[in-house]
From Swiss-Prot:
Belongs to the MurCDEF family. It is found in: Cytoplasm. It comes from the Bacteria. The keyword Methyltransferase does not apply. Pfam families: Mur_ligase (PF01225), Mur_ligase_C (PF02875), Mur_ligase_M (PF08245). GO terms for molecular function: ATP binding; UDP-N-acetylmuramate-L-alanine ligase activity. The keyword Cell cycle applies. HAMAP family: MurC (MF_00046). This is UDP-N-acetylmuramate--L-alanine ligase. Its EC number is 6.3.2.8.
Length: 482
């Protein structure tokens, strides 16, 4: 199946010519900016510092400003902002004063989706991986989709790409409820967990109702793809008044996995689909959570008529996403080496899934985790869960909380987490005040065969490459690109 529609209707946003992104280096912003650049719009943007992301956009023709100043927005026809941008930002204030429209990033994404067959992936966990798998399988099926992803797709070298077909595949962000702007043709709900609860006034029922409202943005002929294994998704399923397909390990699911075998980084399983032949597939990712992500992908690909051969190829050829159990390489230690992994997981459910994946794929190896909590509010709200989950590592080093703009909350810091985990009696965590201290602290703790994971959503993401370059680990072997 090959679909190419060069005459695809494109967003003609009236009098809009120049689009300015406030915080253009953000993972949710840069992808939309790149697609708009490729559509021929003038794009400018500002961020607090230059980065490889802003340099990439600049190479495509974007005008990049370092720092936020009123004059940056002076010639814009519209400003795009994320929820992280303060309304007092001078560029936003100038735009409002001059009556220049200021729109959330999700509204701009919705404008792109309006002209395409939109596939929106929602859920507390697994959005980025599922969206990336969909992009890979659709490409293998000859559908050349446009995609906007919250992580760098290894095969494409970017988190966004303008395709030639009618399909647009994107993440749907529930963190600020902005996914309600989207009106896709197909929507996935991977799971629903307690996170970003300030958006929902601490009311979990409100969070559930918002997911149902999101699914009702589908047309009556659309499709809701829902994970039956998640108890909350199962709970809201009867409320969804749209066509649905379910997936999971449950025997009740429309599309389910059996005979799961994990061998290191590879996971093999059999897919059972109603009215279809069983399908033998493999993915280059460990863990049952990634089997579920693959099942969501298979459900949509099957519904869209993508061949089984293309599904198998797209899944087996998937090269992963940046910071989603990304293997950096091998660090030399006495008697052998240590596998170094970088991971974005920052919720107890995500940490638990990674630990389970390691235990399943490498049962005889010790797990050393360097973890950085993300946001004081999340640490406070999920404190007991963090204590329980992090205590399942063999060795644990805790960095101070990455604030993400929040003020400290008493009792919700990493020193207190260390104390609480230590009281459980299973292990004695080590507190790290600064990331620069990691190499000399962690090296004496490592043994040949260990798996070392740097995990979290903050600046812990820079530590794996630093360890690879550290003189203390001279001779480190970089993971070869697949």
């Amino acid at each position: 199946m090959v679909e190419s529609q060069k005459a695809m209707p494109q967003p003609k946003m009236g009098r809009i010519r120049r689009i300015h992104f406030v915080g253009i280096g953000g993972v949710g912003m840069c992808g939309i900016a790149e697609v708009l650049l490729n559509l021929g719009y003038e794009v400018s943007g500002s961020d607090l510092k230059a980065s490889p992301v802003t340099e990439r956009l600049e190479s495509f023709g974007a005008e990049i400003f370092v720092g936020h100043r009123a004059e940056n927005a002076a010639t814009a026809d519209v400003l795009v902002v994320s929820s992280a941008i303060n309304p007092a930002n001078p560029e936003v204030a100038t735009a409002l004063e001059r009556r220049i429209p200021v729109v959330p990033r999700a509204e701009m994404l919705a404008e792109l989706m309006r002209y395409r067959h939109g596939v929106a992936v929602a859920g507390t966990h697994g959005k980025t991986t599922t969206t990336s798998l969909l992009a890979s399988v659709f490409a293998a099926g000859g559908l050349d989709p446009t995609f906007v992803i919250g992580g760098r797709l290894t095969a494409a070298g970017t988190n966004a790409q303008l395709g030639t077909s009618r399909y647009l595949i994107a993440e749907a962000d529930e963190s600020d409820a902005s996914f309600l702007h989207l009106q896709p043709m197909v929507a996935v709900v991977t799971n629903i967990d307690a996170d970003h609860m300030a958006t929902y006034e601490g009311d979990f029922n409100k969070l559930k109702k918002t997911f149902v409202e999101f699914l009702h943005n589908l047309p009556f002929y659309g499709l809701a793809v829902m994970c039956l294994d998640d108890p909350v998704v199962r709970e809201i399923l009867p409320q969804v008044k749209r066509p649905t397909v379910t997936y999971g390990f449950s025997e009740e699911a429309d599309i389910r996995a059996i005979n799961v075998r994990q061998q290191g980084m590879q996971t093999h399983f059999t897919v059972l689909r109603r009215d279809c032949e069983p399908l033998e597939v493999s993915v280059n990712m460990p863990g049952n959570h990634n089997v579920l992500n693959a099942l969501a992908t298979i459900a949509i690909a099957t519904d869209e008529g993508i061949t089984d051969e293309a599904i198998i190829q797209g899944l087996s050829g998937f090269q992963g996403v940046g910071r989603r159990f990304q293997v950096y390489g091998e660090l030399p230690v006495e008697g052998g080496s240590v596998m170094l992994v970088d991971d974005y997981g920052h919720h107890p459910t995500e940490v638990a899934a990674v630990i389970k994946a390691v235990r399943g794929g490498w049962p005889s190896r010790r797990l050393v985790i360097v973890y950085q909590p993300h946001r004081y509010s999340r640490t406070r709200d999920l404190y007991d869960d963090f204590v329980q989950v992090l205590g399942d590592a063999n060795v644990l080093l805790l960095m101070e909380v990455y604030p993400a703009g929040e003020e400290p909350i008493p009792g919700a810091d990493s020193r207190q987490l260390c104390h609480s985990i230590r009281q459980r009696g299973k292990l004695d965590p080590i507190y790290i005040e600064r990331g620069a201290e990691l190499a000399p602290l962690v090296k004496p703790l490592l043994r040949a065969g260990d798996i070392l994971i740097c995990q979290g959503a903050g600046d812990v993401g820079g530590l794996a490459p630093q360890l690879m370059k550290s003189p203390l680990f001279a001779g480190a072997k970089q993971e070869k690109s697949k």
